[in-house]
């Protein structure tokens, strides 16, 4: 059987994930580590696996991920989007299912920049009336 690769890129905050799906048994590696050791929190792992669970393809594909930037939650979000896009490349009929679950939408929220004259993005110095 010929090995077929499906690629997807996901971003969240400053994290960038490059995902490669190959036909296999459901093995998931992130930066050459097992995904359970890379993402210790079960909620983060579940969030990352959502596209595979919803499409019922968890044991059909092996997932290889290269991710950098951001924290673990942002990386999990980036991986989730990358997996969803790669699944869409392999099975275009999944689009309505993934779209309904909101897995194809890039979360555009990121840190607001600090403005001059303020202590943080919106926190102003204490005001004194007298």
Curated annotation (Swiss-Prot):
<dbReference type="GO" id="GO:0006412">
    <property type="term" value="P:translation"/>
</dbReference>
<dbReference type="GO" id="GO:0003723">
    <property type="term" value="F:RNA binding"/>
</dbReference>
<protein>
    <recommendedName>
        <fullName>Small ribosomal subunit protein uS9</fullName>
    </recommendedName>
</protein>
<dbReference type="InterPro" id="IPR023035">
    <property type="entry name" value="Ribosomal_uS9_bac/plastid"/>
</dbReference>
<comment type="similarity">
    <text>Belongs to the universal ribosomal protein uS9 family.</text>
</comment>
<dbReference type="InterPro" id="IPR020574">
    <property type="entry name" value="Ribosomal_uS9_CS"/>
</dbReference>
<dbReference type="GO" id="GO:0003735">
    <property type="term" value="F:structural constituent of ribosome"/>
</dbReference>
<dbReference type="InterPro" id="IPR020568">
    <property type="entry name" value="Ribosomal_Su5_D2-typ_SF"/>
</dbReference>
<dbReference type="InterPro" id="IPR014721">
    <property type="entry name" value="Ribsml_uS5_D2-typ_fold_subgr"/>
</dbReference>
<keyword id="KW-0689">Ribosomal protein</keyword>
<keyword id="KW-0687">Ribonucleoprotein</keyword>
<dbReference type="InterPro" id="IPR000754">
    <property type="entry name" value="Ribosomal_uS9"/>
</dbReference>
<dbReference type="Pfam" id="PF00380">
    <property type="entry name" value="Ribosomal_S9"/>
</dbReference>
<dbReference type="GO" id="GO:0022627">
    <property type="term" value="C:cytosolic small ribosomal subunit"/>
</dbReference>
